[in-house]
């Protein structure tokens, strides 16, 4: 029996990496009976057959798991936002951060296309990013002339997953970091201010200290797993301020003696962050009941 990590899934075949050696495996029938499927990122025990093939017998407990697309045991989620084309959006950034925290993932913010933005645009974005740095988020800026290896060297060891809307340059980033990948890229639509996802499946690529992956389908953000009462925990600044509210179950919407709203009025919590919290709270409150 060998132990390795699933690095790719195509047509029901799980490719497992064992210290640089790859094996094509399939899960045993017992997984189907349990209605459980291995996912990319899983640590698995498998039995080798025919030298480079085998059957998965056991999936180790997951530290965390992203549902869409399915990836497990993520050490850091890099949220990729472009300075321009598509334009930088704090609302979208906050939504990605909520997703990250809801799945117990450690987020990092990466701003691409630094070189394509005007000086005024970059200054405005940097002022905004200081707010996120103050909250505690690691942030980086890159352009086409950046040292991509040095950028990645700042990231955690283990599995790094790139997330972000289509067109922000995730595949371009990976191609610049590892030119041998030759991943497909697409121009963004001027009318829609976004691109089409060019990544069709999740695959882990080797890097120093671990793996790196792009995520297809991550542009369609889904909050169905989050209840409105949980949302405040996923806005870090609001969560910390909320510990001083009069009522323990305060959701910082209409409740009296709310410390969060007091800090918003003082400007200590940015108005735009609170607005995004309210918008998402209302979206979750108004969604249809699932049966």
From Swiss-Prot:
Domain annotation CP-type G: ranges: 63-221
E.C. no: 3.6.1.-
Entry's Gene Ontology molecular function annotations: GTP binding; GTPase activity; metal ion binding; rRNA binding
Keyword Nucleotide-binding on entry: yes
GO biological process: ribosomal small subunit biogenesis
Keywords: Cytoplasm, GTP-binding, Hydrolase, Metal-binding, Nucleotide-binding, Ribosome biogenesis, RNA-binding, rRNA-binding, Zinc
Family designation: Belongs to the TRAFAC class YlqF/YawG GTPase family. RsgA subfamily.
Record protein name field: Small ribosomal subunit biogenesis GTPase RsgA
HAMAP family recorded: GTPase_RsgA (MF_01820)
Task of the protein: One of several proteins that assist in the late maturation steps of the functional core of the 30S ribosomal subunit. Helps release RbfA from mature subunits. May play a role in the assembly of ribosomal proteins into the subunit. Circularly permuted GTPase that catalyzes slow GTP hydrolysis, GTPase activity is stimulated by the 30S ribosomal subunit.
Cellular compartments per GO CC: cytoplasm
Domain of life: Bacteria
Oligomeric and partner information: Monomer. Associates with 30S ribosomal subunit, binds 16S rRNA.
Cofactor(s) needed: Zn(2+)
Lineage: Bacteria, Bacillati, Bacillota, Bacilli, Bacillales
Subcellular location: Cytoplasm
List of residues binding GTP: 112-115, 164-172
